[in-house]
Amino acid sequence: MSLSLSLAEARRLALAAQGFDGRRTRRSVQRRHLREMLARLGLLQIDSVNALVRSHYLPLFSRLGPYSMTLLDEAAWSVGRHRQLFEYWGHEASLLPLEHYPLMRWRMHQAADGQGIYQQLARFGREQQPLIRQVLQAVREQGALGAGSLSTRQERAGPWWDWSAEKHALEWLFAAGELTVAGRRGFERLYDLPERVFPAELLARPELSEAQAQRELLRMAASALGVATEKDLRDYYRLSPAQSRARLAELVEAGELLPVRVEGWSQPAYCPGEPQVPRRLGASALLSPFDSLVWERARAERLFDFRYRLEIYTPKEKRVYGYYVLPFLYNGRLVGRVDLRAERARERLAVHALHAEANGMDDAALHELAEQLRSMAAWLGLATVAIEGRGELAVRLRGVLL
């Protein structure tokens, strides 16, 4: 029997899988709440842009409400029992649960062979092994080090992007799994040997074959997405089309993923078992541009009729919506875009622009947006919300916030 879903059902299924089916406002968010949500999502994308807050903090706020960012810092970079995560290339630079470390070993082996990494870094790995071994020895002898501690470069210009040769060596060793990220100093990575960072039991686990690991990554992607096309599934952990299609066929044949038709989708989709679609889902949140609900832009357009592009690197005069625009999820639909900035020197959360989608934003949506903005400002330690944008919608929001 062929399964089919309406577009509205697919949206609710996707939102529930992504953690938008729970109670957002708790009296206190505890470590276990973060651990449970991270297990559902599978990973958090890391990005250096700090216009609002580092992107890896936002997805948990969107789903759980205000929480102590120290909890995530401890989970990601502490020493001891509170450490639950590690950094690696999942969906771009990512934080992943420690138990998923064995699932990435095949990718580390490929990186060591110059596969699946930037061409310039692969070339560096082929040409600069003596320097790479020197850098590894320095870390072995001195402990966790950042690129700044090793750099001998006197000038900014050089043949390897704008990185020092030592930074390239560290990045190559990280990609190859010979080093890992022990912590961060500010936003600078501190690299150390995996055996000095991770439990011995974790490193001693048997390695999976590439096929086994890729099947598990696709299973986890399907669980995190709820319903997804082959391209959606492979994008979650950045598998190649060849890797994804072969493993997907095996999972379907084994009955672990079920094909499903979604209204309006031209490509077949897949679910991890018989879909359990929530009858109603009224989730509302401001979303990071790097949130796993929207990071695959074609999927966001298919699910929500929401065409979304990040305009950070677009010249100001050519931007349509703004520099750092967060989609606004209201009652399970993406209804608006908010260009936000944390202006810490002025202790305010500034709305530089506000745009509604074609169906507009009614008073109830604006009141919910105002609550989201107040909550975010308090979470970031900012005293006020300031509406800098112009237009009728901004005027209405300003009135709601008064």
PLM regions and their residue ranges:
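Long, charged, low-complexity, helical-prone intrinsically disordered regions
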Residues: M1-L402
